[in-house]
């Protein structure tokens, strides 16, 4: 009550921010007459003037009034479009590291030109980030004339571009591209083998369009660059045949492990678990199929990978549905983006899930992939010095933007008042009743010439509605799963009188639906239109536009509520643009996923009390409130998941930044010999310590083991036993110095043969390749640790703290392994002529290029807990037999027999 009173007196923070910015807008408007008097040349010269002022130390914020006035005037001359005052406000919000919420149709694309121009003046680059390649190209080409008029260069960053083309795009003042491509380029740059291969500059300012989609909806799925791993397709096929014999547990007991069925499903967390009966049955079937030996357990260390196959196959059959989560096309399983309904060609699920789905569908199984590099959007976009974003719906997620990205959300007022009618939800008992009501509503509205946009949450649902409309003889267009440039064209014409368009989630987002259709596209279709033709097209459009307005404007039908209120608001926001008439309504049934999982008991209880009959709908504020509460539950759960993901990824992010920083330093220097010498000293000290403990008695020395290690790992023949025999007084310290000196001299002889420059290049190449190889293995180990760490909670330990502690220990061990591997490779390489080193370097580069060609980019992963960290250690030790005198794999530096080997 007190907060409401204070807000009434002083205004909300949003109001105060807009009042402050309105004063600057007034200044810009006062400048307009003077700016209008400038010639084109004088207006263009303003860009150079601003740059000079910045170079002399003037603060960027001081340029806002004049710079915005210049962009507005340039837009008037180039496009014939003048920025509204609310667009100037939006531009200022975007310059202040904030999220600007601007309603659909308020001109976000034109608004973005203001902060993009202002921040490009420093010459450090601006990245305008969009959700797909089509929008990136469209916005870049549409705005190119304006920016080039003002003397700025434009670049477009698209997939499959060559490195020189990408470098040119990033060198431009303003670069348009997708969030995926910017992120993948960052990862690829940090896998480059020479400075010339890198394409990005330092990350300066990112302006993210549809920011809620990119920073929230896609935040849970990291960007991953992966390479091929071992082939295990046969096992997926064999395990897949067993899964259909398992029966789902009907009732979810508090102890799902003791249930009646073979597996239980948790729909809220999208997890599936074997019950005790299921475990017994699957073990029995595995034995009968000859996959597992009699008397073995699926949970025994030797069967960890088999458990991985069973879990993946079970999830593929139970949790992933054809035409909802994926489609099968030309013998290939293609993921469907849950947020947009579009197919994601070339993207694959990780952890063997994609292979399990391929086995289920009977298509060719492709090899599993191993992660080479990964980053979440949360951590990628936080690398920018300055970040801002815009969307039509951000206010419901303001807390998340603030807590994770430190971005405030400012709601920018509309240019004209919103008059759209948002009708109350109608709830039916069954899906069939709901679909029937939707068809009748469409029939009535189209009969009056009113255009209708039907929003669905999946391809499957859009096809169901489409089939019913076809049966009813209602002409319509369907947008789902396949993104192409025509999508925007279809969406732009969805405002034609009586048009019916079905679209999944956000298909066509970024394109306005103009009442009466788009006259611009009609003119564009003509080769060389005359003035008369253009006038006739505009006149015909005006008649259609007026007819649609008279019928009530665009009507939005939601076939069910989404998990997030924000996505519902996005669908509603397609109607009522720029003060146009419009309406919206959601149709729900008790069989909808959201209602079934989160709101079923309470709402179905209400419906029973009201004595509803088949075909009747309930329309009541209580129901709407219950649904809103269900959505809040889901939003809260999803926020917790994203927050938890970030907390864990922050640990990996610190390590990633350290590795990438070290790697970039390595790329930028030509001579790493000092580093090599320092590493060699550390490695030999650690190695000798394993066999000759410091200040120990000679009886404790393992000279035979040391000689063997030096021979095997460093190709050094050192008669240490003979030295000690010939020189009884040989001191331990002197012995250490002699071993190191001999190693250095042996290496110097190699250097004399091949030449200093060649050896420096080879050293650098070996360091880079070894670093990449160990980092790749470390990422896999971190994944396994992350998947099993939640089990530490059962031991009354904080999983996050345990993860931080163990991942740091793993990182330290990796750095020690890096030193050892580098010195081992450099010591063992046999060279006689410079050509041999050159051949080795060429071979190394060819191998790196081959791996680069085999890389797969993915932004769709699945974070299921498949293996515990303890199980991974055992599995790894079973894969590779460790000799008793070998260094212990734990990275302690001790011999295996003196460390973890003592347990056997």
Swiss-Prot record:
Primary location group: membrane
GO molecular function: ATP binding; metal ion binding; protein-exporting ATPase activity
Residues that hold Zn(2+) according to the record: 888, 890, 899-900
Recorded family membership: Belongs to the SecA family.
Short name of one Pfam family: SecA_PP_bind
Gene Ontology terms describing biological process: intracellular protein transmembrane transport; protein import; protein targeting; protein transport by the Sec complex
Cellular component GO terms held in the UniProt record: cell envelope Sec protein transport complex; cytoplasm; plasma membrane
Organism from which the protein derives: Yersinia pestis
InterPro entries (alphabetical): Helicase_ATP-bd (IPR014001), P-loop_NTPase (IPR027417), SEC_C_motif (IPR004027), SecA (IPR000185), SecA_CS (IPR020937), SecA_DEAD (IPR011115), SecA_motor_DEAD (IPR014018), SecA_preprotein_X-link_dom (IPR011130)
Source domain of life: Bacteria
PROSITE patterns tied to this protein: SECA (PS01312), SECA_MOTOR_DEAD (PS51196)
Keywords, sorted A to Z: ATP-binding, Cell inner membrane, Cell membrane, Cytoplasm, Membrane, Metal-binding, Nucleotide-binding, Protein transport, Translocase, Translocation, Transport, Zinc
Name this protein carries in UniProt: Protein translocase subunit SecA
Gene: secA
Enzyme class per UniProt: translocase
Needed co-factor(s): Zn(2+)
Disordered: annotated span: 851-870
Subunit structure: Monomer and homodimer. Part of the essential Sec protein translocation apparatus which comprises SecA, SecYEG and auxiliary proteins SecDF-YajC and YidC.
Entries under SMART domains matching the protein: SecA_DEAD, SecA_PP_bind
Binding positions for ATP per the UniProt entry: 87, 105-109, 512
Annotated membrane topology: Peripheral membrane protein
Keyword Ribosomal protein part of the UniProt annotation: no
Catalytic reaction list: ATP + H2O + cellular proteinSide 1 = ADP + phosphate + cellular proteinSide 2
Compartments (UniProt record): Cell inner membrane; Cytoplasm
Note on cofactor: May bind 1 zinc ion per subunit.
Database matches in Gene3D superfamilies: Helical scaffold and wing domains of SecA (1.10.3060.10), P-loop containing nucleotide triphosphate hydrolases (3.40.50.300), SecA, preprotein cross-linking domain (3.90.1440.10)
């Amino acid at each position: 009550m007190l907060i409401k009173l204070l807000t009434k007196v002083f205004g909300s923070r949003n109001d105060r921010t807009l009042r402050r910015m309105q004063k600057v807008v007034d200044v810009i408007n006062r400048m307009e007459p003077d700016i209008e008097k400038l010639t084109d040349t004088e207006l263009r010269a303003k860009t150079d003037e601003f740059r000079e002022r910045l170079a002399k130390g003037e603060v960027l914020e001081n340029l806002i009034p004049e710079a915005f006035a210049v962009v507005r005037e340039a837009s008037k001359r180039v496009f014939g479009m003048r920025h509204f005052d609310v667009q100037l406000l939006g531009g200022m919000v975007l310059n202040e590291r904030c999220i600007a919420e601007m309603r659909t149709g308020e001109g976000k694309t034109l608004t973005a030109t203001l902060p993009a121009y202002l921040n490009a003046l420093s010459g450090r680059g601006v990245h305008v980030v969009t959700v797909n390649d089509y929008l990136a190209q469209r916005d870049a080409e549409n705005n190119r004339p304006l920016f080039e008029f003002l003397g700025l260069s434009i670049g477009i960053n698209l997939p499959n571009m060559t490195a020189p083309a990408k470098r040119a795009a990033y060198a431009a003042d303003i670069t348009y591209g997708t969030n995926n491509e910017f992120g993948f380029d960052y990862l690829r740059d940090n896998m480059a083998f020479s400075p010339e291969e890198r394409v990005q500059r330092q990350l300066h300012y990112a302006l993210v369009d549809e920011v809620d989609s990119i920073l929230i909806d896609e935040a849970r799925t990291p960007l991953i660059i992966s390479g091929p791993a071992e082939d295990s397709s046969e096992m997926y096929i064999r395990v897949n045949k067993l899964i259909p014999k398992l029966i789902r547990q009907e009732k979810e007991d508090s102890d799902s492990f003791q249930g009646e069925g073979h597996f239980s499903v948790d729909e809220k967390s999208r997890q599936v678990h074997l019950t005790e009966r299921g475990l017994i049955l699957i073990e029995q079937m595995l034995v009968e199929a000859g996959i597992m030996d009699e008397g073995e357990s699926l949970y025994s260390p030797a069967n960890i990978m088999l458990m991985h196959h069973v879990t993946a196959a079970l999830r593929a059959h139970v949790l992933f549905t054809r035409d909802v989560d994926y489609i099968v096309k030309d013998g290939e399983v293609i993921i469907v983006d849950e947020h947009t309904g579009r197919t994601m060609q070339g993207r694959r699920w990780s952890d063997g899930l994609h292979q399990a789905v391929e086995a289920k569908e009977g298509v060719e199984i492709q090899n599993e992939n191993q992660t080479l590099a990964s980053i979440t959007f949360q951590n990628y976009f936080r690398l920018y010095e300055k970040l801002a974003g815009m969307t039509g719906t951000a206010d419901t997620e303001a807390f998340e933007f603030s807590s994770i990205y430190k971005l405030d959300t400012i709601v920018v007022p509309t240019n004209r008042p919103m008059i759209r009618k948002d009708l109350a939800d109608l709830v039916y008992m069954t899906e069939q009743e709901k679909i029937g009501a939707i068809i009748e509503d469409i029939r009535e509205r189209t009969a009056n010439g009113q255009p209708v946009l039907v929003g669905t949450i999946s391809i499957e649902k859009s096809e169901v509605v489409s089939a019913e409309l076809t049966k009813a003889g209602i002409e319509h267009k369907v947008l789902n799963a396949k993104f192409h440039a025509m999508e925007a064209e279809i969406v732009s014409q969805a405002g034609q009188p009586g048009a019916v368009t079905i679209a999944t989630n956000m298909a066509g987002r970024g394109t306005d639906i103009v009442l009466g259709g788009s006259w611009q596209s009609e003119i564009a279709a003509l080769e060389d239109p005359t003035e008369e033709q253009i006038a006739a097209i505009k006149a015909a459009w005006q008649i259609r536009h007026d007819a649609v307005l008279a019928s009530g404007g665009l009507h939005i039908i939601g076939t069910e509520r989404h998990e997030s209120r924000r996505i519902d608001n996005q669908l509603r926001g397609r109607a009522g643009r720029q003060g146009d008439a419009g309406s919206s309504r959601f149709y729900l049934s008790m069989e909808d996923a959201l209602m079934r999982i989160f709101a079923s008991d309470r709402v179905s209880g209400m419906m029973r009390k009201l004595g509803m009959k088949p075909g009747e709908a309930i329309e009541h504020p209580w129901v709407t409130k219950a649904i809103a509460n269900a959505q809040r539950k889901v939003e809260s759960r999803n926020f917790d998941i994203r927050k938890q993901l970030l907390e864990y990824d922050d640990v990996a992010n610190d390590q990633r930044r350290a590795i990438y920083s070290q790697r970039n330093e390595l790329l930028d220097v030509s001579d790493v010999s000092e580093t090599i010498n320092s590493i060699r000293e550390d490695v030999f000290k650690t190695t000798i310590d394993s066999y000759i403990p410091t200040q120990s008695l000679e009886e404790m020395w393992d000279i035979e083991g040391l000689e063997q290690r030096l021979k095997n790992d460093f190709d050094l023949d050192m008669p240490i036993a003979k030295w000690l025999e010939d020189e009884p007084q040989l001191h331990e310290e002197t012995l250490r110095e002699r071993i190191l000196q001999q190693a250095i001299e042996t290496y110097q002889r190699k250097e004399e043969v091949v030449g200093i420059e060649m050896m420096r290049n080879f050293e650098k190449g070996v360091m880079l390749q070894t670093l990449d190889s160990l980092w790749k293995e470390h990422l896999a180990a971190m994944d396994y640790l992350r998947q099993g760490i939640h089990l530490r909670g059962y031991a009354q330990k904080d999983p996050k703290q345990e993860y931080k502690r163990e991942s740091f220990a793993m990182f330290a061990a990796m750095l020690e392994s890096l030193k050892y591997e580098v010195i081992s490779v450099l010591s063992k390489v046999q060279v006689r002529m410079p050509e041999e080193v050159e051949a080795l370097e060429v071979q190394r580069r060819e191998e790196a290029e081959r791996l680069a060609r085999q890389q797969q980019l993915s932004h769709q992963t699945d974070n299921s807990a498949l293996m515990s960290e303890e199980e991974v250690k055992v599995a790894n030790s079973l894969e590779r037999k460790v000799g008793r005198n070998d260094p212990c794999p734990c990275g302690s530096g001790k011999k295996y027999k003196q460390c973890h080997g003592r347990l056997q």
